[in-house]
A protein has these predicted regions:
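Eukaryotic intrinsically disordered, low-complexity regulatory tails
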Residues: 55-56, 122
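Short Gly/aromatic-enriched secondary-structure transition segments
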Residues: 39-47
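Basic/polar, cationic surfaces and motifs that engage anionic cell-wall
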Residues: 1-26, 30, 63-67, 72, ...
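A short acidic/small-residue loop/turn micro-motif
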Residues: 74-76
Length: 166
Protein backbone atom coordinates (compact mmCIF):
# COMPACT_ATOMS: atom_id res chain seq x y z
CA UNK A 1 0.00 0.00 0.00
CA UNK A 2 1.18 3.48 -0.65
CA UNK A 3 1.39 5.90 2.25
CA UNK A 4 -1.82 7.89 2.71
CA UNK A 5 -1.88 11.64 2.14
CA UNK A 6 -0.97 13.01 5.56
CA UNK A 7 -0.98 16.72 6.39
CA UNK A 8 2.02 17.64 8.50
CA UNK A 9 2.42 20.58 10.86
CA UNK A 10 5.67 21.96 12.25
CA UNK A 11 4.92 20.95 15.84
CA UNK A 12 7.45 21.46 18.62
CA UNK A 13 7.47 18.97 21.48
CA UNK A 14 8.95 18.84 24.92
CA UNK A 15 10.67 15.59 25.90
CA UNK A 16 9.48 12.49 23.99
CA UNK A 17 10.20 8.81 24.59
CA UNK A 18 10.74 6.02 22.06
CA UNK A 19 8.06 3.38 21.58
CA UNK A 20 9.26 -0.06 22.71
CA UNK A 21 7.14 -2.02 20.23
CA UNK A 22 4.10 -1.78 18.00
CA UNK A 23 1.57 -4.31 19.25
CA UNK A 24 -1.65 -2.30 18.93
CA UNK A 25 -3.35 0.49 17.05
CA UNK A 26 -5.67 2.22 19.51
CA UNK A 27 -8.62 4.30 18.31
CA UNK A 28 -9.80 7.46 20.14
CA UNK A 29 -12.31 10.28 19.67
CA UNK A 30 -12.41 13.85 20.94
CA UNK A 31 -15.27 13.09 23.31
CA UNK A 32 -16.03 16.67 24.36
CA UNK A 33 -19.54 17.64 25.44
CA UNK A 34 -20.22 18.80 21.88
CA UNK A 35 -19.47 17.02 18.61
CA UNK A 36 -16.46 19.26 18.06
CA UNK A 37 -13.79 19.08 15.38
CA UNK A 38 -10.20 19.85 16.31
CA UNK A 39 -7.10 19.74 14.13
CA UNK A 40 -3.84 18.12 15.20
CA UNK A 41 -2.41 21.62 15.57
CA UNK A 42 -5.28 22.72 17.86
CA UNK A 43 -5.00 19.57 20.00
CA UNK A 44 -1.23 20.12 20.20
CA UNK A 45 -1.77 23.69 21.43
CA UNK A 46 -4.28 22.49 24.09
CA UNK A 47 -1.98 19.72 25.29
CA UNK A 48 1.01 22.10 25.47
CA UNK A 49 -1.13 24.56 27.49
CA UNK A 50 -1.66 21.70 29.99
CA UNK A 51 2.15 21.55 30.32
CA UNK A 52 2.32 18.22 28.46
CA UNK A 53 4.91 17.34 25.80
CA UNK A 54 2.42 18.12 23.04
CA UNK A 55 -0.30 16.26 21.17
CA UNK A 56 -0.59 12.76 22.59
CA UNK A 57 -1.79 11.16 19.35
CA UNK A 58 0.19 9.99 16.32
CA UNK A 59 -2.62 10.79 13.87
CA UNK A 60 -5.81 12.88 13.80
CA UNK A 61 -8.56 12.29 11.23
CA UNK A 62 -10.75 15.31 10.55
CA UNK A 63 -14.43 15.12 9.57
CA UNK A 64 -13.52 15.72 5.91
CA UNK A 65 -11.27 12.63 6.02
CA UNK A 66 -7.98 14.55 6.08
CA UNK A 67 -5.34 12.63 8.02
CA UNK A 68 -3.05 14.88 10.06
CA UNK A 69 0.26 14.01 11.69
CA UNK A 70 0.60 14.42 15.44
CA UNK A 71 3.51 12.89 17.33
CA UNK A 72 6.34 11.29 15.39
CA UNK A 73 5.73 7.56 14.88
CA UNK A 74 8.95 6.56 16.66
CA UNK A 75 7.65 8.07 19.91
CA UNK A 76 5.32 6.81 22.60
CA UNK A 77 1.90 8.35 22.45
CA UNK A 78 0.29 9.76 25.56
CA UNK A 79 -3.22 8.38 25.42
CA UNK A 80 -3.78 4.97 27.03
CA UNK A 81 -2.45 4.06 30.48
CA UNK A 82 -0.04 1.09 30.37
CA UNK A 83 -0.19 0.83 26.55
CA UNK A 84 1.62 3.99 25.42
CA UNK A 85 4.99 2.21 24.94
CA UNK A 86 3.52 -0.48 22.65
CA UNK A 87 0.89 1.26 20.55
CA UNK A 88 0.15 3.72 17.79
CA UNK A 89 -2.83 5.98 18.35
CA UNK A 90 -5.34 7.32 15.85
CA UNK A 91 -7.69 10.07 17.02
CA UNK A 92 -10.90 10.96 15.16
CA UNK A 93 -12.33 14.46 15.59
CA UNK A 94 -15.80 14.35 17.10
CA UNK A 95 -17.80 12.94 19.98
CA UNK A 96 -19.09 9.58 18.81
CA UNK A 97 -21.45 9.10 21.71
CA UNK A 98 -23.35 12.09 20.31
CA UNK A 99 -22.60 12.04 16.59
CA UNK A 100 -21.32 9.53 14.07
CA UNK A 101 -18.04 9.53 12.18
CA UNK A 102 -18.37 10.76 8.63
CA UNK A 103 -18.03 8.47 5.63
CA UNK A 104 -14.76 10.28 4.88
CA UNK A 105 -13.40 9.59 8.37
CA UNK A 106 -14.29 5.91 8.11
CA UNK A 107 -12.61 5.52 4.71
CA UNK A 108 -9.48 7.36 5.85
CA UNK A 109 -9.36 5.37 9.09
CA UNK A 110 -9.67 2.05 7.25
CA UNK A 111 -6.92 2.96 4.79
CA UNK A 112 -4.61 4.30 7.53
CA UNK A 113 -5.14 1.15 9.62
CA UNK A 114 -4.36 -1.01 6.59
CA UNK A 115 -1.20 0.93 5.82
CA UNK A 116 0.00 0.87 9.44
CA UNK A 117 -0.76 -2.85 9.78
CA UNK A 118 1.27 -3.49 6.65
CA UNK A 119 4.16 -1.34 7.90
CA UNK A 120 4.32 -3.01 11.32
CA UNK A 121 3.27 -6.58 10.49
CA UNK A 122 -0.04 -6.35 12.35
CA UNK A 123 -3.48 -7.71 11.59
CA UNK A 124 -6.53 -5.44 11.61
CA UNK A 125 -8.22 -8.27 13.54
CA UNK A 126 -6.94 -8.38 17.11
CA UNK A 127 -4.33 -5.61 16.90
CA UNK A 128 -6.78 -2.72 16.37
CA UNK A 129 -8.78 -1.79 19.46
CA UNK A 130 -10.80 1.01 20.98
CA UNK A 131 -9.42 2.94 23.95
CA UNK A 132 -12.18 1.38 26.09
CA UNK A 133 -10.74 -2.09 25.49
CA UNK A 134 -7.82 -1.19 27.77
CA UNK A 135 -9.02 1.58 30.09
CA UNK A 136 -12.27 2.46 31.88
CA UNK A 137 -13.62 5.02 29.40
CA UNK A 138 -16.38 5.44 26.81
CA UNK A 139 -13.76 6.33 24.19
CA UNK A 140 -13.96 6.07 21.17
CA UNK A 141 -17.72 6.50 21.65
CA UNK A 142 -20.43 3.91 21.00
CA UNK A 143 -21.11 5.02 17.42
CA UNK A 144 -17.48 4.52 16.36
CA UNK A 145 -16.74 1.52 18.57
CA UNK A 146 -19.69 -0.38 17.09
CA UNK A 147 -18.18 0.13 13.61
CA UNK A 148 -14.64 -1.09 14.38
CA UNK A 149 -15.19 -4.62 13.04
CA UNK A 150 -16.50 -3.22 9.74
CA UNK A 151 -13.63 -0.71 9.57
CA UNK A 152 -11.07 -3.45 10.24
CA UNK A 153 -12.66 -5.50 7.46
CA UNK A 154 -12.16 -2.55 5.08
CA UNK A 155 -8.56 -2.20 6.28
CA UNK A 156 -7.97 -5.87 5.53
CA UNK A 157 -9.51 -5.39 2.07
CA UNK A 158 -7.17 -2.46 1.39
CA UNK A 159 -4.19 -4.57 2.49
CA UNK A 160 -5.16 -7.37 0.11
CA UNK A 161 -6.14 -5.22 -2.87
CA UNK A 162 -3.89 -2.15 -2.87
CA UNK A 163 -0.21 -2.74 -3.47
CA UNK A 164 2.53 -0.10 -3.70
CA UNK A 165 1.74 2.29 -6.50
CA UNK A 166 -2.03 1.50 -6.56
Amino acid sequence: MKEPDIKKYDLEFRELYSRQATDYIIIHHTGNDIDEELSAEEIHRIHRANDWSGIGYHFVIRKNGQIEKGRPLWTQGSHCLNYNPISIVIHLSGNFNIGKPTHYQIESLAYLIGWLCEQYGLSPYGNVVGHRDFNATECPGDNLYDMLDEICGKADWYMNNYKDGD
